[in-house]
Amino acid sequence: MAYDHKSIEAKWQKYWDEHETFRAPDKSEKEKYYVMDMFPYPSGQGLHVGHPEGYTATDIMSRYKRAKGFNVLHPMGWDAFGLPAEQYAIKTGNNPAGFTNKNVQVFKNQIKSLGFSIDWSREINTTDPEYYKWSQWIFEKLYEKGLAYEDEIMVNWAPDFPGGGIVVANEEVIDGKTERGGYPVYRKPMKQWVLRITAYADRLLEDLEDLDWPEAIKEQQRHWIGKSIGASVFFNIADSDKQIEVYTTRPDTLFGAQYMVLSPEHELVDEITTLEQKEAIANYKKEVETKSDLERTDLNKDKTGAFTGAYATNPINGEKLPIWIADYVLSSYGTGAIMAVPAHDDRDWEFAKKFNLPIKAVIEGGNVEEAAYTDDGTHINSGFLDGLNKQEAIDKAISWLEEHNAGHQQINYRLRDWIFSRQRYWGEPIPVIHWEDGTQTLVPESELPLRLPEMTQEQLKPSGTGESPLANATDWLNVTRKDGVKGRRETNTMPQWAGSSWYFLRYVDPHNSEALADPEKLKYWMNVDLYVGGAEHAVLHLLYARFWHKFLYDLGVVPTKEPFQKLVNQGMILGENHEKMSKSKGNVVNPDEIVNNYGADTLRVYEMFMGPLTQSKPWSEDGVSGSRRWLDRVWRLLVDEEDKLRDHVTTVNKGDLDKIYHQTVKKVSEDLENMRFNTAISQLMVFVNEAYKSEALPVQYMDGFVQMLAPIAPHLAEELWSKLGHEEDISYVSWPTYDESQLVEDSVEIIFQVNGKVRGKATVARNIDKDAMLDYAKADENVQNFISGKEIRKIIAIPGKFVNIVVG
């Protein structure tokens, strides 16, 4: 008999809602545990099956920690500003707020249908003025500390866009044209707000060491910050009093510099270009205007450039170096100028070959006529550096440069300041007023939040000036000071990153109108103990959140230096064909259908049993139905055809389940603690198999089993808990314990093979049967790597010896 998932799940979701079962008190003698997901952008498509994977993982940890005696904070909110809502509003004439709120409701209903133990009293939405009031407050504090400033920044400008020119994001530019409509895009300087994240570069780098994060994520952050120690070198321009400053990590290769390259936007280009080269330079600059930074720095693209006609002098040997411009050098990195050493840099070598420029080896090894030699070696053709190794030569070159006032040691960062302006309507207004007398002021703190004005469909269209549509809201835009001076509000809005850079703090005190959050509550809850989300946010979101958190720590607003102590990235759920799910491929699975047909608990069990949380794995409809069959089997173990507790659940304990029960409590506890959900479920399956062989099921063991099931399949567990005669719900019942003395027994090591090759092993009870051995084998992480997505053709199991899984 199958259990009725629809009525059971509706019943317990209603119960949890009415009793506010998961509301977390801010004052408790219990130790706190703060667990959260990266909050979703509520798109019009709703949830896909990838979302519940991470959400189920955090929910299991929340439920487990509650049972272990922790005061658990498990909140949810909405990262709800974003371009799609604005595009929808322009197209339909509907307000983006209405579109967004409708999407939020769809997401919320879907999330609630999965039975997550969320404290909904703390729900936040980044588009709520009472929320973005504090985003604006943080901006004002950054401004007051000199960490928010205006600068001329190159943007992607589409002047021919219908309704007037528009600025588009890098990701909206494809081959020099807008993604929507295919209108030409040009690079154009425009005033933008910028946040000085570089002031925190060293701390952002150093404090990574204290975090329990995947090493790969830490490495990506280190790479993005890109700290390097090198030298600034000054090259005098021939027949000019100007100098070009170059930053290089390899001053030891100065003797190999053969030409110089400036970015086409470099301030000296027009000044130093000779009359003969002016037309070529102007044409090249126009050609580059339509290329994004991503296109320009693509390593595989053909090298292009133009000669300025000017020369610079190499300070170390006096050689004249031709000065070129090329798009592979960006004005935003370093000084926007490089010394080219084609013998030992791939891009410089390709450029030199393309334009027939000389190549001179200064490090021994390789054939530089065939390819750049980028390994280490002894210095040659380098005067006083000859015979030295890399580090010795770098140190000596820097000393020489400093002695001759031709350069100095320099620490550089790849990290650039954060461009904080967006030419959009649907974002947080930046609380600045520009006055006609040339001054600017912040909107007074007492007047925050500065709310977005209601706008018509016509007003939401591009302003035509490059400003956001807010420039069309004249009543909102124009202000007059008490002394009669007129002013205009800032028309740029904040990027979507703003709301997600501090939301974890607002969950702590979401309804506070006087402060971002109460200091005592922050002291109790921070920092976040477990943060789960996709690896695609490994760099920017986490870096920006860490930056704002450190700034707020310096202000004394938050009590910790870092926001997230432990970070886990869930793996991607792929389509059945191992491809990424996408609408265009037609392989997207809607979780609503799974919940409707199989139940939320089935989806939860299946997604956690698919494999290790952090690995990508393919979706399988057969796997879903298999998970449902197991839950039906659990139900039948305890409940009869009359919907009553079976007679063989008894207070009598014959002892035949003692060992497997205590083994299961130990294994499941350890696995949940370490987020090994697939092997925890596997152990529960082993226990169920053994329980079916027993004539009497001790009620104490059945209680414990249902408690262990509860974090993973909470609706079914609650129903079984009530069938077992308990009045209270299961959420706060103390986690079962095991007796170490019951674990002492004869054990044996068994081998797991795939196609005859050893892929794993485990220590198990000597009397284990074939089915249980197979369950252990399938749960082994390494075995899963070799059988995932393959057809199992045969299984050979010798009890106490080995399991061999034959796949095709």
Curated annotation (Swiss-Prot):
GO function terms (MF aspect): aminoacyl-tRNA deacylase activity; ATP binding; leucine-tRNA ligase activity
Classification via Pfam families: Anticodon_1, tRNA-synt_1, tRNA-synt_1_2, tRNA-synt_1g
Renumbered ranges of motif 'KMSKS' region: 580-584
Binding residue positions for ATP: K583
Top-rank EC class of the record's enzyme: ligase
Record-linked PROSITE patterns: AA_TRNA_LIGASE_I
Keywords: Aminoacyl-tRNA synthetase, ATP-binding, Cytoplasm, Ligase, Nucleotide-binding, Protein biosynthesis
Position of sequence motif 'HIGH' region: 40-51
EC number from the UniProt entry: 6.1.1.4
GO biological process: leucyl-tRNA aminoacylation
Reactions catalysed, as given in the entry: tRNA(Leu) + L-leucine + ATP = L-leucyl-tRNA(Leu) + AMP + diphosphate
InterPro entries named in the record: aa-tRNA-synth_I_CS, aa-tRNA-synth_Ia, Leu-tRNA-ligase, Leu_tRNA-synth_edit, M/V/L/I-tRNA-synth_anticd-bd, Methionyl/Leucyl_tRNA_Synth, Rossmann-like_a/b/a_fold, tRNAsynth_Ia_anticodon-bd
GO CC terms: cytosol
Main subcellular location of this protein, as a coarse class: cytoplasm
Domain of life: Bacteria
Subcellular location: Cytoplasm
Family listed: Belongs to the class-I aminoacyl-tRNA synthetase family.
Protein known as: Leucine--tRNA ligase
Source organism of the structure: Leuconostoc mesenteroides subsp. mesenteroides (strain ATCC 8293 / DSM 20343 / BCRC 11652 / CCM 1803 / JCM 6124 / NCDO 523 / NBRC 100496 / NCIMB 8023 / NCTC 12954 / NRRL B-1118 / 37Y)
